[in-house]
Amino acid sequence: RRTAIELGADNAPYVVGAADQGGYADVISPPSSRPLQNGDVLMLDTGCVWDGYFCDFDRNWAIGQADELACRAYDVLWRATQAGIDAARPGATCRDLYVAMSTVIAEIDDSGGEIGRLGHGLGMQLTEQPSHAIFDTTVLKENMVLTIEPSLSYGNGKMMVHEENIVVSEGQARLLTERAQPELPMI
């Protein structure tokens, strides 16, 4: 939070996260006195405000090392995020973004995912319409600000989520966040 404000954010109202061996079971977990351990996957989600506008993003890290399944889940999630970014063009629909991401997610998570969303609008509120969901046929327009936020389930009750912020533009969506590394970072 302090770093975000030092780098120019007016406010960083929250930092939430989760961590456990090989992955986490919930995106927003209550605080725990359990120390991080070798093999944990840590996710932090934060939002900042600048001049009244929100950003909303998260990142994942492995503590020490990651098991093969967590690395595979991260790879699928990174590629699903890229599919969402690539699909975000004027004239596409939120459903198109959802389908692009869920097609990649299905490589590891065959739960179907017909409930929920894989991103949302972003602006003067942290979460705005539209929703990247199977039911949302909102047509994307140039200069819309969106999150690309795929999530997936894997292993025995584990999940992983990733989030980037973009501006819809002709040709290619423009990232507002620094794109996460293509491989699960180890710290």
Q: Where in this protein do the model-derived segments appear?
A:
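Active-site neighborhoods and metal-handling regions in enzymes and metal-associated proteins
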Residues: R1-I187
